[in-house]
Amino acid sequence: MSSSTTVFVSGASGFIAQTLVKQLIEKGYKVVGTVRSNEKGDSLKENLKAAKLQSENFTYEIVKDIAVKGAFDDALKKHPEVTVFLHTASPFHFNVTDIEKELLTPAVEGTNNALQAIKTHGPQIKRVVVTSSYAAVGRFADLADPSIPATEESWNPITWEQSLSNPLAGYVGSKKFAEKAAWDFVEKEKPNFTLSVINPVYVFGPQAFEIKNKSQLNTSSEIINGLLNSKPDSKFDNLTGYFIDVRDVAKAHIVAFEKDSIQGQRLILAESPFSTQSILDLIRKDFPQLDSQLPKGDPSQADAWKKAESKIENEKTRELLGFKFIDFKKSIDDSVAQIIG
């Protein structure tokens, strides 16, 4: 891929996507992003400019609702220069009333709409990368089982019906069924493009640009922000899982379309396991000035993930990508430094 390549990024104002757009511009790519409003598009352009990056290489198109049939048609018709499509747009929030209507259907339809638009209006597009989630791969929440490892071949066993039981199950289901839809599309339609899929775990790390509104961080960053806003006597849920840094998630999207060997592959982006307690312990150690304001929790529960999480085996992904992931300490420290800065 040369730097004259134009890359299409759906959902460009999302947490991962902003870092992705930033890295693409830094590497000399031209970027067409979709956003839900002019305000979001202008804000992203201004942020790129403020970061002294070539903001003229970023343009945006408005797609108010990715689940509407033909949502991406006009944007692709207007940009015949696009040869790579990175589909990051998907609903990710838990304040929903109708799980099927607000999470499951939009995720599946959004993916189908993007791929159908590429097939019909973007025959010159050769590479497509879809942002899925570890939720589509591994046994999650109630289904987690430490005795069953998760690999790039694994699928979450959740059913459509199980997905309707609560918003977290709805989110998990939306990721699984949207990713299934992408692979099914390629299988059935035999389009001009190759597909690869990125499946990140909990994504930590700093926002791409200076944070203007600290009350609205992405859902994963809220875990760190929630701890920083707690009081010494606050109680918290000791959440467990695996983490990956947002800068590595963005980088993986780029490597995924640049490298021939990654075409047709699923990648699991996970660096190491964590618990809310282990985040807290690290913050208190590395930011002693915050120690007196934070709860102590129960340090003996720092490795609670051992009993609660399926083991992730993603050696294949690491080998295909060929770069070393940012470690837990750097990811959390950089996140905290930005929030308190």
Swiss-Prot record:
Keywords, sorted A to Z: Cytoplasm, NADP, Oxidoreductase
Record-listed NADP(+) binding positions: 40, 171
GO MF: methylglyoxal reductase (NADPH) activity; oxidoreductase activity, acting on the CH-OH group of donors, NAD or NADP as acceptor
Nucleotide-binding listed as a keyword: no
SUPFAM superfamilies named in the record: NAD(P)-binding Rossmann-fold domains
Keyword set includes Ubl conjugation: no
Gene Ontology annotations of biological process type: lactate biosynthetic process from pyruvate; methylglyoxal metabolic process
GO cellular component: cytoplasm; extracellular region; fungal biofilm matrix
UniProt cross-references to InterPro entries, sorted A to Z: Epimerase_deHydtase, NAD(P)-bd_dom_sf, NAD(P)_dehydrat-like
Gene3D superfamilies named among the record's database cross-references: NAD(P)-binding Rossmann-like Domain
Principal location listed in the UniProt entry: cytoplasm
Entry coiled-coil feature ranges: none
Family of the protein in this entry: Belongs to the NAD(P)-dependent epimerase/dehydratase family. Dihydroflavonol-4-reductase subfamily.
Other remarks on this protein: Has antigenic properties. Elicits a specific immune response in systemic candidiasis human patients undergoing malignant hematological disorders.
Function recorded in the entry: Catalyzes the irreversible reduction of the cytotoxic compound methylglyoxal (MG, 2-oxopropanal) to (S)-lactaldehyde. MG is synthesized via a bypath of glycolysis from dihydroxyacetone phosphate and is believed to play a role in cell cycle regulation and stress adaptation.
Name of this chain's protein: Putative NADPH-dependent methylglyoxal reductase GRP2
Organism, as annotated: Candida albicans (strain SC5314 / ATCC MYA-2876)
